[in-house]
A protein has these predicted regions:
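Membrane-embedded helix bundles of polyisoprenyl
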Residues: 17, 123-136, 142-226, 238-266, ...
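Transmembrane alpha-helical segments
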Residues: 126-133, 173-185, 213-221, 314-318, ...
Length: 908
């Protein structure tokens, strides 16, 4: 009987899941869209798709080598931005999640199909694990199935799950953690809990943090269910027991978790604090939209997503009006979750104290689904009080939605909310009819009717959320078959086809997606990874270039020849009609000193004649303290003349320059200190002198946006608004200044910006137009014109090239070359600094300095020096040993546990 019920439960869930997927995602099918989020924001393509395609390829390569008898584990890849550790960078997206091993069976070209399938598979598994948990808690079969469908087909999956596939993982793991906790309390085997902790830790430490918090809360609540005597002693013993199992699970995952955490601790994305005023309360619109979209189809903001099926509205109202003691506990859990969602401080705490964000809302989905599984059978035996209360609640909710939508505020208009209100009313009326007829959940007509209503509900949700006539969410996703082709466009193919055996970097100017290097195996100067080394972030920020939008999102170096050459950028493609802002395209900026190789359509390939090898030497140095006092141009010119070190070198023969020694930089302050964009005028013009033989830049110091002064009512409703930035136009070249306000969750402390002006013009003066993309006031401390003689830049580059390494070889974890030293110097190796690199010179271990902000410096003594650098992921070896011991410990524990258990059974 139990086996038949289990089969029926999983069978009905599977059938309903397939049918609901078809109707919910119908707009994706009719519009020819994939689930790769990349047509609007690039996260889905640049981060997830490219990482998973790369991971699949890496898995196949690893096993090919293993079967061939020469196993090789590549730990570093130069195509990850400027170069980065593979495990610590890609654990956030791919490595560690057991499900992602399936990508090893598909080629990069077919990754999109697997990508779409994996999102649906994760959703399906989330429902399965919920059913396993609910059955353990003795919930009735059909209520459990509906609860699982409510859990899966919610706003969290439809929005965050489609954008970031691994965001669905905690929905799989949390029911397993709760199941494991129940098993431990019931003195059953602890393996479910241990393995759930292990897999959570391997998959993603970010969600492990949240899962740990909610698992502790769950275990604390359930403790009082299982313990009636000696509560204090048992509480301490329970902490000890769970702590032991949790630690064992963490230790089993240490081989992946430890390197990933080390990488996170060296991350440059966070660390600039948060505006405490933003943690007090959300803008007024958030609360209005939260109520509307609890069963609606829109979004609230701060990554808060509810969007539950309409039946949830009835379940919640039923719970609120129920007087049963058991239901009071459910009600308390639900209300506590709602309170946490309406106060930013909880989003801040649950998001690792970085900024207020409610990605933890999957826990609310779990609570709501559990409420549904528990309450559904009781909806057929409602008391008069409950019937009246639920009916009144539906009417009040509907009237509220009508009033809010009729307010005239565009941001509050909710497409389809009346359809949602209508559906909740239909559910309610149907339940009343069934109750009047004496039907319960066992009646076939009840099950069929509810199944049809659920299909209609999710179909309506899919229509309004995804369809172009609704919120048009599908327009943010890429067309089917487009993802791989986009990463192989003409400018990228031209760079890939360059026949040059040397080690170098490339840059695709005007190409929108940052992580194109990963699956094309190109060394680039662009990157967009949530885990980016702090030294890389800080160095690029110090350049004051416009290509850096966020701390972890950077693109090129504004075609500044010095920076390009210092980074070893040898080949460049320029798109002569690229998009820089909405409905705004730009002709490409071609740096001086490059040689045109060929052209295809609007894409031209150039060779940088002044590109330096991956290692070059200096006679003198400057300290980082001196370096940080300079603006972006000063830093660039300083690196052309002397190496920048994080500490004084041991070799006293290396000259320390007290003053910057480089090209002659001229700075002229302009009189403006404030630029406004009053009504009717959205731009300002600045005329600047330019000289053909000089690099010319416009430097904004402490540029901030004060925003548009709204009335108090408007401010309360919308909160503070940031700016879309400033579009800088000179002739046919467009550049964009990305300005972030302190209340922006991605603010990283940037206020200085440098705009490259002299685009090989012959005019004596140039007009620069600043187009303000958002109304308001833009203020800065100083605006300066900076010029640098081109001949001085070229002379310094020539000097660096004359003092460069020969016979350079790079492959995976190894870099080597030969340098002929005429006198003591410091070699700069343009690979990002990491403690995982170890250097030897002529076979002797040598100290590595952090050089030029993010690269590595090695002291070279006079003579011919053979340099070798080898890389090992920090924490990998010790993590592997910890995991090995933990797995052995689990085996020993398992044998002991089974032996002890059998002994107890025999005694009984």
């Amino acid at each position: 009987m139990i086996k038949e019920q289990r089969k029926y439960c999983y069978g009905v869930y599977t059938l309903m899941f397939l049918l609901m997927c078809i109707v919910a995602f119908l707009p994706f099918f009719t519009e020819g869209k994939s689930f790769v989020w990349g047509a609007g924001v690039e996260d889905g393509l640049s981060q997830h798709f490219s990482s998973l395609a790369y991971y699949g390829e890496a898995l196949r390569e690893f096993f090919r080598n293993l079967l061939a008898g020469h196993p090789k584990l590549v730990m570093w890849d130069m195509s990850l931005g400027y170069g980065a550790d593979i495990l610590s960078t890609l654990n956030y997206y791919a490595i560690g999640d057991p499900l992602n091993l399936l990508y090893g069976f598909v080629s990069p070209k077919n990754t999109e199909t697997m990508y779409d399938f994996m999102i649906l598979l994760r959703m399906y598994l989330a429902g399965i694990t919920f059913i396993i948990y609910a059955r353990k808690m003795k919930k009735r079969s059909y209520g459990t199935v509906i609860g699982a469908l409510v859990y899966v087909f919610s706003g969290f999956c439809f929005r965050l799950g489609l954008r970031h596939p691994f965001f669905i993982n905690p929905m799989i793991y949390f029911p397993l953690l709760c199941l494991g906790i129940e098993k431990i309390y019931q003195r059953e085997r602890p393996y479910v809990f241990i393995f759930a902790v292990c897999v959570s830790a391997m998959s993603n430490y970010y969600f492990l943090y949240m899962l740990t918090i909610f698992a502790v809360i769950y275990a604390w609540i359930r403790f009082y269910k299982y313990t009636e005597e000696n509560k204090m002693i048992n509480f301490c013993l329970t902490i000890l027991k769970f702590g032991m199992y949790y630690t064992l699970g963490i230790a089993m995952a240490a081989v992946i978790l430890l390197p990933s955490v080390i990488g996170f601790l060296g991350n440059g994305r966070y660390g600039n604090g948060v505006d405490w005023k933003s943690l007090i309360v959300y803008p007024g619109k958030y609360y209005l939209l939260f109520i509307e979209n609890f069963i609606g189809y829109g979004n609230m903001g701060s990554n808060t997503n509810a969007g539950y099926l309409p039946i949830v509205g009835i379940v919640v109202l039923f719970t609120l009006f129920s007087q049963r003691m058991k239901h009071k506990k459910y009600r308390a859990a639900f209300i506590a979750s709602i309170i946490a969602l309406i106060l930013p401080i909880f989003g801040y705490a649950f998001n690792g104290f970085s900024y207020a964000n409610n990605r933890w809302a999957f826990a609310l989905s779990f609570i709501v689904a559990l409420l549904t599984a528990e309450m559904y059978p009781r909806l057929f035996v409602m008391s008069k009080r409950q019937q009246i209360g639920i009916g009144a609640g539906i009417i009040i909710y509907t009237v509220f939605c009508i009033i809010v939508n009729a307010s005239g505020e565009e941001i509050l208009k909710n497409k389809g909310i009346m359809a949602a209100c209508g559906l909740i009313a239909v559910f309610y009326i149907l339940l009343l009819i069934f109750q009047r007829l004496g039907y319960d959940t066992q009646k076939r007509i009840v099950r069929v009717s509810m199944a049809i209503l659920l299909l209609i509900s999710v179909g309506v949700h899919g229509y309004y959320r995804f369809d172009p006539k609704g919120y048009a969410y599908t327009q943010e996703f890429m067309d089917q078959g487009q993802a791989y082709r986009t990463l192989k466009e003409d400018n990228i193919r031209m760079l890939s086809k360059v026949n040059d055996p040397s080690v170098y970097r490339v840059h695709a100017e005007g190409y929108r997606y940052k992580n194109y290097g990963l699956i094309n195996h190109l060394n680039t100067i662009s990157g967009y990874y949530s885990i980016t080394a702090k030294c890389v972030t800080d160095t690029i920020k110090g350049y004051d270039t416009l290509g850096m939008q966020y701390a972890d999102k950077y693109k090129g170096v504004d075609q500044r020849l010095g920076l390009l050459s210092l980074a070893g950028v040898k080949y460049i493609t320029v798109a002569h009609n690229s998009q820089v802002a909405k409905d705004v395209s730009s002709m490409g900026d071609v740096p001086y000193g490059v040689e045109k190789l060929r052209k295809k359509g609007n894409i031209t390939l150039y060779k940088n004649k002044y590109a330096l090898p991956f290692a070059y030497a200096y006679d003198s140095y400057m300290t980082e303290q001196q370096y940080e006092q300079l603006n972006g141009i000063g830093k660039e010119q300083a690196m052309l003349a002397q190496i920048i070190l994080n500490q004084h070198p041991a070799d006293k023969e290396i000259q320390h320059n007290e003053q910057r020694n480089g090209p002659d930089i001229q700075t002229i302050s302009l009189p403006e200190t404030r630029i406004s964009s009053p009504k009717g005028k959205k731009y300002a013009d600045i005329t600047v002198p330019v000289e053909k033989d000089k690099e010319t830049y416009l430097y904004f110091k402490n540029l901030v946006y004060h925003g548009k002064k709204n009335g108090d009512d408007k401010f309360i409703l919308t909160g503070r608004k940031g700016t879309k930035g400033i579009l800088v136009t000179q002739n046919d070249v467009q550049q964009k200044i990305h300005i972030q306000s302190t209340f922006n969750p991605y603010y990283f402390g940037r206020k200085d910006y440098i705009v490259k002006i002299n685009h090989q013009t012959r005019k004596a003066k140039e007009k620069v137009r600043l187009n303000f993309l958002s109304p308001g006031e833009y203020e800065f401390d100083d605006i300066s014109l900076i010029t640098v003689p081109k001949k001085d830049v070229l002379a310094r580059l020539k000097e660096r090239k004359e003092n460069s390494m020969k016979q350079i070889q790079y492959e995976g974890n190894h870099f080597r070359g030969v340098y002929h030293v005429k006198k003591d110097q410091i070699l700069c190796v343009t690979i990002p600094y990491s403690k995982g690199w170890k250097a030897t010179v002529n076979g002797n271990r040598t100290k590595i300095y952090k050089a030029n902000g993010m690269f590595m410096g090695i002291i070279m003594k006079k003579g011919t020096q053979s340099v070798k650098l080898d890389y090992e992921t920090p924490g990998l070896k010790i993590g592997a040993w910890i995991s090995l011991v933990a797995w052995i410990g689990l085996g020993i524990y398992g044998l002991y546990f089974e032996k002890y258990r059998k002994k107890l059974l025999n005694q009984c």
